[in-house]
């Protein structure tokens, strides 16, 4: 896909990985990094594009508040970090988008939400309505209740949908 095709797209899905949101140590959100990413999204919206952000980072954002310095290996601690970090992540996005008078929303999905037709259709309707209202949906895998998703990186699959 050419740069011209990307800049003229009416709808853009941006996948943001944890390493793009955290400081050098990778264990805390970096507000300036989030602000820079949001500035790019805001520029896309300003030219008329609908933008969906698929963002990782909940586990990374939850590490420092829990006193953890590295990503935990066990599922329960990963889920605890995701639970703490998701609120921090969305709060940072909300604050960053507010600088541009843009409303952001949180959409947490699980595998069930994309494989069960009725769940998928409901999520799809919600996303379409958010875009219609001018909101930037911030989609993340619901890592606090997910199991295999944490290990297999389902945000990549979410972005592809």
Task: Identify the residue ranges that each predicted region occupies.
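Nucleotide/pyrophosphate-binding catalytic subdomain
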Residues: 1-161
């Amino acid at each position: 896909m050419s740069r011209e095709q990307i800049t003229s797209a009416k709808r853009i899905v941006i996948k943001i990985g944890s390493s793009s949101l955290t400081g050098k140590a990778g264990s805390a959100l970096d507000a300036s990094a989030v602000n820079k990413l949001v500035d790019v999204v805001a520029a896309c919206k300003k030219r008329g594009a609908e933008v969906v952000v698929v963002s990782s980072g909940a586990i990374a954002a939850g590490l420092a508040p829990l006193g953890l310095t590295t990503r935990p290996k066990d599922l329960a601690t990963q889920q605890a970090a995701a639970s703490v970090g998701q609120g921090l992540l969305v709060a940072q996005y909300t604050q960053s988008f507010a600088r541009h008078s843009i409303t952001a929303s949180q959409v947490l999905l699980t595998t069930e939400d994309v494989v069960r037709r009725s769940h998928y259709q409901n999520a799809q309707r919600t996303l379409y309505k958010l875009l219609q209202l001018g909101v930037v949906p911030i989609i993340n895998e619901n890592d606090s209740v997910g199991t295999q998703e944490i290990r297999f990186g389902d945000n990549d699959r979410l972005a592809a949908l």
